[in-house]
Amino acid sequence: MTRRLFTSESVTEGHPDKIADQISDGILDALLAEDPRSRVAVETLITTGQVHVAGEVTTQAYADIPSIVRRTILDIGYDSSRKGFDGASCGVSVSIGSQSADIAQGVDNAFELRTGASESALDAQGAGDQGMMFGFACSETPELMPMPIALAHRLSRRLAQVRREGVVPYLRPDGKTQVTVEYEGLRPVRLNTVLVSSQHAADVSLESLLTPDVREHVIAPEVEGLGLGLDVEDYRLLVNPTGRFEVGGPMGDAGLTGRKIIVDTYGGYARHGGGAFSGKDPSKVDRSAAYAMRWVAKNVVAAGLAERCEAQVAYAIGKAHPVSLFIETFGTETVPVERIEKAVTEVFDLRPAAIIRDLKLTRPIYSQTAAYGHFGRELPDFTWESTDRAADLKSVAGA
């Protein structure tokens, strides 16, 4: 059988784009904590010594945005210009307006309600925008995620952990990981390459200190004994292949909200509708429907209806009901795909108000999603990772 290589990357919480995501979601959480009906679309730009926050907000809540910005940056570990940024002394500018009345009328008074087609409360809320959203799940890992992105996230979390705990004290917050896995057909069989790039203090030897420390403290705990049928012997390790990574964080690269959408999702292993997540309240289907599609796909796989599942939903702005639903199982289905799709429509209500209700998305839970992936982490607040509908799907599909 033909063997192929597939690669995915992750980044640490100190990557400039991820700093921006965490600031945007920190502001969102502060507003939702006081007013769960807040409408929020907040973008962050971070560059050398400066943070710019802009967007549209309609809310009854108050958020001290400069304080949230500084606290987020300091919590990540940027507390000195020697590390590339200092949250205590950086400049913060804020430019926030209110949500467009034209958008608001479609969200608050959906097409179905305006035309008299329905009087259901769940039909009152229209989609906040048009677009298509994808979800994916597969049986490669216990969390039903693709192996490359799952392992890349584990390594980036570990890289941040050893820095925070002082195990490798000369590391700085900015970092990236990349994992290449060899596949035989649809099955991951061998770890091919691991790449780790980490910001570090000056005068650190790459060969005698950084590479051995990364191998021992970052990679070995995550890779050795991984199991899952993956051969982890003799993989290639690349650490800081530029030779030096002293200038990092926003001093090295500007960061923007929404620039790591592939890291946030499936590492390129599945399709993406194009909409970013961070800084958006759940009335924005870019976020809420993408979470719902992960929920759908994961339940399809958990129900044993397929080994891998990609689900697409699409919306028209101002309409409550989706305009389309598409299920792809890549030939791994155990019942006809048409039955799976029909079961999904019966078991899941994909109107925006129903998604928000069922997944409890008006809670201030989003800061914890903003680094290390929105999917594949089975945390209590990540309701879209639940497989609570698997039994119903299996029953309706007749499996």
From Swiss-Prot:
Tell me the superkingdom of the source. Bacteria
Q: Which residues bind L-methionine?
A: E56, Q99, D253, K284
The UniProt entry's GO biological process terms, in alphabetical order, are:
one-carbon metabolic process; S-adenosylmethionine biosynthetic process
Q: Which GO terms describe its molecular function?
A: ATP binding; magnesium ion binding; methionine adenosyltransferase activity
Subcellular location as annotated: Cytoplasm
Entry keywords, A to Z? ATP-binding, Cytoplasm, Magnesium, Metal-binding, Nucleotide-binding, One-carbon metabolism, Potassium, Transferase
Q: Which residues take part in binding ATP?
A: H15, D174, G175, K176, R244, F245, D253, R259, K260, A276, K280
* CC annotations in GO: cytoplasm
User: How does this polypeptide assemble, per the annotation?
Assistant: Homotetramer; dimer of dimers.
Q: Which family does it belong to?
A: Belongs to the AdoMet synthase family.
Please state what the protein is called: S-adenosylmethionine synthase
Q: What does the organism's lineage look like at the top?
A: Bacteria, Bacillati, Actinomycetota, Actinomycetes, Micromonosporales
